[in-house]
Regions:
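Extended, subdomain-level signal for the structured scaffold at the beginning of enzyme domains
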Residues: 1-33
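A generic local structural motif
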Residues: 4-8, 39-42, 98, 135-137
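Residues at the C-termini of beta-strands that transition into short coil/loop
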Residues: 6-8, 82-84, 113
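Flexible, charged surface loops at secondary-structure boundaries
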Residues: 11-15, 47-48, 142-143
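Cysteine-nucleophile active-site neighborhood
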Residues: 24-104
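Amide-donor transfer/coupling interface in amidating biosynthetic enzymes
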Residues: 87-148
């Protein structure tokens, strides 16, 4: 059974088999953060129990300690992890193709964001042959290294 969670209405997500939160604009993210905070303890408990989760784009940023918007205002994430996000004025849009220690095959994705993730000690993507890595200002084709 799929249970939609409507902002402002609340829902009991305890015991969910799968949690999904889709991406939105940076402006919508701030409003979502206020509502999402009520689920902090439940999401953390679900993560500890091994519940499968998919948080895309700006939704994933809410799992960290905080988000600082392009104007310099900071608001809290739920603190599932200690990373922070700092949003800039430049939007990076494009395909991503890279490798990770999580899977034997390459991974393919799409990026549409203006936030840089900071404080991730073990990068998820260890090689990138197409696209931009988080926190980088240049293409990996001219600057090889670790990404995201």
């Amino acid at each position: 059974t799929v249970q939609p969670v409507v902002p402002g209405e609340g829902a009991d997500i305890t015991g969910a088999d799968f949690l999904f939160m889709g991406a939105g604009t940076e402006r919508a993210q701030r409003f979502a953060a206020e509502d999402f905070a009520r689920y902090s303890a439940t999401v953390k408990a679900a993560a500890e129990d091994g519940t499968a989760m998919l948080f895309a784009g700006t939704a994933m940023e809410l799992l960290g300690a905080s988000v600082t918007d392009r104007d310099g205002d900071t608001y809290p994430g739920i603190g599932l992890a200690s990373f922070t996000t700092v949003q800039g004025k430049r939007r990076i849009v494009g395909d991503v193709y890279g490798v990770t220690a999580l899977f034997p095959e390459a991974v393919v994705g799409f990026m549409n964001k203006c936030g840089q993730i900071r404080g991730v000690e073990a990068p998820l993507l260890t090689g990138l042959s197409l696209g931009f890595g988080t926190g980088r200002t240049c293409s990996p084709l001219s600057s090889p290294g670790q990404f995201w």
